Amino acid sequence: MDFETLIAALGGKLGVELDGADGACGLAVDGVDVVLQDAGDLLLVHTDLGEPPPQDPAALFQAMLEANFLYGGTGGATLAISPSDGHVHLQKYTWLERLDAEGALLFVDRFAETAARWIALLADYRPAGADGDDAQSSDSGFLTV
């Protein structure tokens, strides 16, 4: 199944019209903004988890590296720092040919659950009362599912 067909089928499963013609589609899943992106034979899902804590981010970076080891703390995804904005990102690939609408929905749901755990973890690394740059906002323009 190609990306556009998968996105249309996913929309059918959700009861909404989704368009993957531009090679990407954004969904808000349980408050987590998830981008589904065409990566050739692969489906890439990714999300911006926000800025690392300003004071001593080394502890968070250590936790990220340990979580990435054998994907034990990421549900098979990868945590990274974006070179463009310095934010923490979570990303995961899977083969398009292995997915149907039901499988894609499950894949995205599980990814969003993992992302939500990391969003909460990032908040725990911030000092009490600090307002970090919350990358997840209700005005993202993403379709809420």
Describe every region a protein language model picked out.
Residues 63-64, 94-127:
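Ampiphathic alpha-helical segments that act as solvent-exposed interaction surfaces
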Residues 1-34, 82:
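Charge-rich, low-complexity N-terminal segments
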Residues 44-47, 89, 99:
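Short small-residue beta-strand/loop micro-motif enriched in glycine and branched aliphatics
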Residues 48-87, 93:
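Short, internal acidic amphipathic alpha-helical interface segments
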Residues 30-33, 41, 86-87:
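Short acidic/polar mixed-charge low-complexity motifs
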Residues 36-51:
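A short acidic-to-branched-hydrophobic micro-motif
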